[in-house]
């Protein structure tokens, strides 16, 4: 029966192996010097030579004619090659991974070899062993006799217990380069009389993805395509359902041109042709990386020779290629880890250049050269009177304080005017930071301590209460803030800050009032956003209700805070919505009060809002009666839009819990290039 190519041409000695030269050198020296450990761990991708090396090592330590390599002629070598050696045990750890199997192995370890010098245990797919099995191996591995060697082969090194790692030597088998795979495929094709072009071999090596075994399997498969003519690149693409270069470049051009209709049309065509999308994504990523390098450097040599003609015809900005690279990586598993090492480095360079381009200015680094100070000249001593500095008659004025003109309130009710004054920036409430003020030497009375929400704490309140916290619901503590600007008159000078002290009390940041949020949201209310958020909320409530009926406890695990999610399931409706906030109506007053406070102070609560509504939002929640008494009148008195509430603090709050950005790079590309669904250009 004919052997498949990867079995027929599997290396049987060290000199036949490719791509793992450093590992080969270390192991050969260890065998020659008789300094083998009790165990080896071989980790790496499939088809990189782990099991092959293990079997060659088993021959090497038992070879009767060892001279830097195995002879493949002695009794030991031939027995191992034919899989009939009774002292070499090749175990499939994926199927024999139970504690009973390991106990049986441990009992036999201390028996002397029957025929050879050493016994070898090769455990393939070792990461499949159970924790109990690993525990059973610990003592055996540590106290193994000198005539026993363990070799663990795995594709998932991270699953090997640290206690095992500390008792073995670990080697990481890298993927075989495309050049080495192509060279080996050419040698095998010549020996098997397979007529195939160089371009076809290059494509097969690329399809192998660093696995020499996969490359030989692909060559074996394509060898049956035709017995009479030479196999070409087109034959390979047709056999394995691959895109030709015209189709790949056509797709990239459609995407980067913003032609959504053509892009979707091409994808549908690819699907009807049975295209291998797994390989297509990997090729698309690698090709886009090369095109970015070409456009950025102007050097066509960075693109593969077969793609250079098509690459020269494209006319796109490097930023567009960078965005496409990020979109593929963010939405699929085909990022840099699937590329060759050189392409991985190129992808890193793209990410760095793209990040640097967003920075407004990065100053050049100038190294500080330390020089030896010259010897000081002798200065005659002066009397105390002579040494006094001569002060000017009057210090020049560097700054003066002016008052910004007051803006008349657009709300008749003075209390409402305090509520709807909006912040310049927002301070996280629980931070309890203290705000230092610029010294005002011209003022006789203490200036009102201003917060960052457009309100000021009344001076008499500051004098009476000092540093004690203020109630956010009591509006009698506050008055409209007077903004003070520092304006340079002559030359700039450092601003002197007053340090906080008992004689100079400073303001304490206050929490946002939910009425403030509600009025701001209403000032920017968008009916489309109301419908959008209501739809998201209804969908969430349906799933939540269904999970409660079926007692599906796993449903709530997807949310950062199950209590916040449970509260939100009791919303009656979305009353108003803006890009930065929501107004929600509840029946339960306790839930409404608790929810808006937690949304401002609790990272898990804000993260749950982000998970349900898909963006960070200020939340204002009421019962219907509360809304009518606290907000409705103020909303009706609005004469112009209030300021927008900034979301930076909420984003920082939720980012401590939610690790992934909600908006992917693919969505960024869609926003940039796709100007509407199925639009004609």
UniProtKB/Swiss-Prot annotation:
E.C. no: 2.7.7.7
Domain of life: Bacteria
Stored InterPro entries: AAA+_ATPase, DNA_pol_III_sug/sutau_N, DNA_Rep/Repair_Clamp_Loader, HLD_clamp_pol_III_gamma_tau, P-loop_NTPase
Any single Gene Ontology cellular-component annotation: DNA polymerase III complex
Residues reported to bind ATP: 44-51
Gene3D superfamilies per the UniProt record, alphabetical: 1.10.8.60, P-loop containing nucleotide triphosphate hydrolases
Pfam families in UniProt: DNA_pol3_delta2 (PF13177), DNAX_ATPase_lid (PF22608)
Enzyme class: transferase
KW Heme (keyword) present: no
BP terms from Gene Ontology: DNA-templated DNA replication
Family: Belongs to the DnaX/STICHEL family.
NCBIfam families: dnaX_nterm
Protein name: DNA polymerase III subunit gamma/tau
Lineage of the species this protein comes from: Bacteria, Bacillati, Mycoplasmatota, Mycoplasmoidales, Mycoplasmoidaceae
Gene assigned in the entry: dnaX
């Amino acid at each position: 029966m004919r052997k498949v190519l990867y079995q027929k041409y599997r290396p049987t000695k060290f000199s036949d192996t490719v791509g793992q030269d450093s590992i080969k050198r270390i192991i050969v020296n260890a065998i020659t010097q008789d300094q083998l450990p009790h165990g080896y761990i071989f980790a790496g991708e499939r088809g990189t030579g782990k099991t092959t090396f293990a079997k060659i090592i088993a021959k090497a330590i038992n070879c009767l004619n060892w001279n830097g390599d195995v002879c493949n002629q002695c009794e030991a070598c031939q027995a191992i090659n034919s899989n009939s050696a009774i002292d070499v045990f090749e175990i499939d750890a994926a199927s024999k991974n139970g504690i009973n199997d390991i106990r049986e192995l441990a009992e036999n370890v201390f028996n002397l070899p029957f025929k050879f010098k050493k016994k070898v245990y090769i455990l393939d797919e070792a990461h499949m062993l159970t924790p109990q099995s690993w525990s059973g191996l610990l003592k055996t591995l540590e106290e193994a006799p000198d005539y026993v060697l363990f070799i663990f082969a795995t594709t998932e090194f991270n699953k090997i217990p640290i206690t095992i790692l500390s008792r073995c030597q670990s080697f990481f088998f890298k993927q075989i380069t495309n050049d080495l795979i192509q060279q080996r495929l050419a040698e095998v094709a010549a020996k098997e009389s397979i007529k195939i072009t160089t371009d076809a071999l290059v494509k097969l090596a690329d399809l192998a993805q660093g696995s020499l075994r996969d490359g030989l399997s692909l060559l074996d498969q394509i060898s049956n395509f035709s017995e009479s003519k030479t196999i070409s690149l087109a034959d390979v693409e047709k056999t394995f359902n691959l895109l030709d270069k015209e189709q790949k470049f056509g797709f990239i051009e459609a995407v980067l041109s913003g032609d959504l209709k053509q892009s979707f049309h091409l994808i549908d065509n690819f699907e009807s042709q049975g295209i291998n999308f797994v390989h297509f994504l990997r090729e698309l990523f690698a090709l886009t990386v090369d095109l970015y390098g070409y456009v950025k450097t102007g050097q066509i040599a960075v693109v593969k020779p077969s793609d250079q003609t098509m690459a020269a015809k494209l006319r796109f900005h490097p930023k567009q290629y960078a965005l496409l690279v990020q979109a593929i990586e963010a939405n699929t598993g085909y990022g840099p880890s699937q590329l060759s090492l050189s392409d991985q480095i190129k992808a890193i360079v793209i990410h760095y250049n793209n990040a640097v381009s967003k920075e407004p200015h990065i100053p050049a680094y100038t190294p500080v050269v330390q020089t030896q100070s010259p010897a000081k000249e002798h200065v005659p001593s002066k009397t105390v009177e002579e040494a006094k500095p001569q002060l000017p008659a009057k210090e020049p004025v560097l700054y003066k304080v002016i008052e910004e003109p007051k803006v008349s309130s657009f709300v008749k009710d003075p209390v409402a005017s305090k509520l709807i004054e909006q912040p310049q920036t927002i301070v996280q409430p629980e931070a309890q930071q203290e705000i230092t003020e610029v010294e005002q030497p011209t003022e006789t009375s203490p200036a009102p301590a201003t917060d960052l929400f457009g309100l000021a704490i009344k001076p008499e309140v500051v004098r009476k209460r000092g540093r004690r916290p203020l109630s956010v619901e009591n509006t009698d503590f506050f008055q409209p803030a007077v903004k003070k600007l520092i304006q340079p008159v002559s030359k700039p000078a450092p601003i002197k800050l007053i340090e906080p002290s008992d004689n100079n009390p400073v303001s304490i940041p206050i929490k946002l009032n939910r009425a403030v949020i509600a009025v701001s949201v209403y000032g920017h209310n968008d009916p489309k956003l109301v419908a959008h958020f209501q739809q998201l909320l209804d969908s969430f409530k349906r799933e939540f209700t269904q999970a409660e009926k079926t007692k599906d406890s796993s449903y709530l695990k997807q949310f950062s805070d199950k209590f916040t999610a449970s509260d939100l399931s009791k919303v009656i409706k979305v009353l108003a919505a803006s890009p930065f906030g929501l107004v929600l109506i509840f029946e339960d007053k306790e839930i409404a009060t608790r929810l808006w406070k937690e949304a401002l102070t609790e990272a898990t609560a804000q993260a749950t809002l982000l998970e349900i509504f898909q963006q960070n939002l200020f939340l204002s929640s009421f019962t219907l009666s509360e809304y009518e008494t606290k907000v409705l009148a103020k909303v009706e008195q609005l004469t112009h839009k209030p300021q927008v509430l900034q979301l930076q603090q909420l984003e920082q709050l939720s980012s401590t819990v939610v690790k992934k950005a909600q908006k992917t790079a693919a969505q960024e590309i869609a926003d940039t290039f796709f100007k509407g669904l199925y639009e004609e250009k």
